[in-house]
A protein has these predicted regions:
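C-terminal accessory subdomain/extension
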Residues: 274-347
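Active-site loop ensemble at the mouth of alpha/beta enzyme cores that anchors a bound cofactor
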Residues: 227-301
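Generic N-terminal amphipathic, Lys/Arg-enriched alpha-helix
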Residues: 4-23
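Conserved, mostly hydrophobic/aromatic
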Residues: 28, 51, 83, 143, ...
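Active-site loop/helix belt of alpha/beta enzymes
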Residues: 140, 146-258
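N-terminal glycine-rich anion-binding loops that anchor highly charged ligand groups
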Residues: 4-8, 27-58, 75
Length: 347
């Protein structure tokens, strides 16, 4: 697979070499307008998470539209450095950074732009304070609260209060608030998503209230992600929603958020049609990243992408679909999970 594939501007989509990740700008811009429009007239604002698309030009389009707080969120230090070099002035690294080398890089970055960082334990807070003090910079800190994700975050209770008090008193750190992420829908079952999400969001808000009762201000309550925006708008105390998937969208969330449409799709070529009931595409595991779910074949009724090896994608065909995909034809695949699929491409 050739990555990146360079084609002159104006090349018809059908003439692109494959596999290729293709972005429909009209659909993407419409997704941005629809999603961020929900925040335009509210005190709660969106903070775009750029980890899914990793593209400064797309992030600019997001910040140029209504409804954001003017900042972005990233998941890795490398992402933060790329977007800082692209001129972004408010970056939240919504993850923990613990190694000495990365803390040095983080502090160097804070000398260039305003950087926020997640913390969920006092030892890490002390590390960050020492690094920031040595570098002569200030790091914005958000205490990460565990709210159902089962990964990073300190549980609601005395530990969270003590951590906030510690951060609030450490040199080189500015306690900006708290953050948390809540789980998305369970597969295709959305029946309990509303209640579960509201409960999980309330855990984060209760952490804010508990910390404030101890005498420490919590001006920012940042929650994530795209799937929880409508519930977050109902919860007093939330100040921002970190959301990443909405500009490009994927099949995983499409049924749950029908107001948004997939803007990024994979163009593949049929390289073989060895038997009536099967066609073979040149988009395999390396092009589609089907780890969390198989991409969906678009526009071919009776056809479905069923299995993938490194460089081959197998499409099962039934009925009239057996006549539709012959060697040399093109096919469209909608990624099931956006971030992993986009990560396969250089652009």
């Amino acid at each position: 697979m050739e990555r990146p594939i360079f084609q002159p501007v104006g090349t018809p989509v059908e003439e692109l070499d494959t596999p290729a990740l293709v972005l429909d700008l009209d659909v993407m811009d419409r997704n941005i307008q629809v999603f961020q429009g929900y925040f335009a007239d509210t005190a709660i604002k969106a903070r775009p998470v750029v980890t899914s698309h990793l593209c400064p030009q797309i992030a600019r389009r997001q910040l140029d539209a209504d409804g954001t707080n003017g900042g972005i969120a990233v998941t890795t230090l490398g992402e933060a450095e790329v977007f800082a070099n692209a001129g972004f002035a408010d970056i939240l690294l919504a993850n923990e950074i613990v190694t000495v080398s990365k803390i040095r890089r983080l502090c160097a970055l804070a000398d260039q732009t305003s950087v926020g960082i997640a913390v969920d334990n006092p030892d890490n807070a002390q590390q960050l304070s020492s690094g920031a003090t040595e570098a002569g910079v200030e790091l914005r800190v958000l205490i990460e609260i565990e709210a159902g994700m089962g990964r990073c975050g300190i549980s609601l209770g005395a530990g969270a209060i003590e951590l906030a008090q510690k951060v609030n008193g450490l040199p080189g750190l500015k306690l900006e608030g708290i953050m948390g992420s809540v789980p998305g829908p369970r597969g295709d079952d959305y029946s309990d998503h509303q209640d579960r999400t509201l409960d999980n969001l309330q855990v984060i808000v209760e952490a804010k209230l508990s910390i404030e009762r101890s005498g420490v201000a919590v001006p920012v309550v940042s929650v994530g992600g795209t799937h929880c925006y409508s519930q977050a708008l109902q919860v007093p105390g939330v100040t921002e929603v970190r959301a990443g998937r909405y500009p490009l969208m994927d099949y995983r969330l499409k049924a749950f958020l029908p107001e948004l449409n997939p803007a990024a799709k994979i163009l593949a070529s049929v390289i073989s049609h060895p038997v009536d009931a099967m066609a073979v595409l040149d988009a395999g595991h390396k092009a589609t990243a089907p780890d969390q779910g198989r991409p969906v074949l678009e526009g071919i009724e009776g056809g479905s992408a069923t299995r993938f090896s490194a460089e081959h994608g197998i499409v099962d065909l039934e009925g009239d679909a057996q006549e539709l995909l012959n060697a040399g034809d093109k096919a469209w695949l909608v990624p099931y999970e956006l971030g992993a699929s986009v990560n396969q491409y250089d652009y």
